């Protein structure tokens, strides 16, 4: 039976970077668990800001967080008050010097994670799942994506038996490593239970320029 590999993990080192970039010789497990908790808590705390991803770097005894968000103003706050408050809280918790970089997501309509969270939010507000899926797909295509697939799973419309439905428009070359495919997952907590939302967004191919070796000069010699 065929299974689908995670599109992000499949392309790590090819056209996708690691989201935790550090190495230590001891206490690796503790720092890894700390990374997971930090990412989870920041996503929950900054839910209104539309956080797409949180990347972690640990240069020396410092902690650097790179937050990609659709609404950076909510995180920064007036005159930087909110981000300073967040930084102080993290420094107190981790006992490290913390640096926070905020990167704006220019087109949230093409970000798979934000699309999944938006659909989940609509499902929690009792919007029909087909309508929510179609609206997200139409919006992504309008902003220039080459292909998009949305899949929802669970007790759709409150049915007794859980099922999955999906909607696909355009191309989605999952086996092509150079394809820039973004993947997102979110959960909608409804009165009937949890509905899972998965999105795949194909934004085109990434071609890496090959390094050209200098060629020897070609000439003619007359003896």
From Swiss-Prot:
Keyword field contains Protein biosynthesis: no
Pfam families registered for this protein in UniProt: KH_2 (PF07650), Ribosomal_S3_C (PF00189)
UniProt cross-references to SMART domains, sorted A to Z: KH
BP GO annotations: translation
Alphabetical list of SUPFAM superfamilies matching this protein: Prokaryotic type KH domain (KH-domain type II), Ribosomal protein S3 C-terminal domain
GO molecular-function term, one example from the UniProt record: structural constituent of ribosome
Alphabetical UniProt keywords: Ribonucleoprotein, Ribosomal protein, RNA-binding, rRNA-binding
Disulfide bonds: none
Chain ranges of the KH type-2 domain: 38-106
Domain of life of the native organism: Bacteria
GO CC terms of this entry: cytosolic small ribosomal subunit
Keyword Transcription regulation set for record: no
Protein family (similarity comment): Belongs to the universal ribosomal protein uS3 family.
Oligomer and partners: Part of the 30S ribosomal subunit. Forms a tight complex with proteins S10 and S14.
Function: Binds the lower part of the 30S subunit head. Binds mRNA in the 70S ribosome, positioning it for translation.
Protein name: Small ribosomal subunit protein uS3
Species whose genome carries this gene: Acidobacterium capsulatum (strain ATCC 51196 / DSM 11244 / BCRC 80197 / JCM 7670 / NBRC 15755 / NCIMB 13165 / 161)
């Amino acid at each position: 039976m065929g299974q689908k590999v995670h599109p992000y993990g499949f392309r790590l080192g090819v056209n996708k970077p690691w989201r935790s970039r550090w190495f230590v010789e001891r206490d690796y497990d503790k720092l890894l668990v700390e990374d997971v908790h930090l990412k989870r808590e920041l996503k929950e705390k900054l839910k209104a800001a539309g956080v797409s991803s949180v990347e972690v770097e640990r240069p020396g005894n410092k902690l650097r967080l790179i937050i990609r968000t659709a609404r950076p103003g909510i995180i920064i706050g007036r005159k930087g008050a909110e981000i300073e408050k967040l930084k102080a809280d993290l420094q107190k918790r981790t006992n490290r010097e913390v640096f926070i970089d905020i990167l704006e997501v220019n087109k949230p309509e093409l970000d798979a994670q934000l699309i999944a969270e938006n659909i989940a939010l609509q499902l929690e507000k009792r919007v029909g799942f087909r309508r929510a899926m179609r609206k997200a797909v139409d919006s992504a295509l309008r902003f220039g994506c080459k292909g998009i697939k949305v899949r929802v799973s669970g007790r759709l419309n409150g049915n007794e038996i859980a099922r999955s439905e999906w909607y696909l428009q355009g191309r989605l070359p999952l086996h092509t490593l150079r394809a820039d495919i973004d993947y997102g997952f979110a959960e909608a907590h409804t009165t009937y239970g949890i509905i899972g939302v998965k999105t795949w967004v194909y934004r085109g191919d990434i071609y890496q320029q090959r390094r050209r070796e200098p060629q020897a000069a070609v000439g003619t010699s007359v003896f």
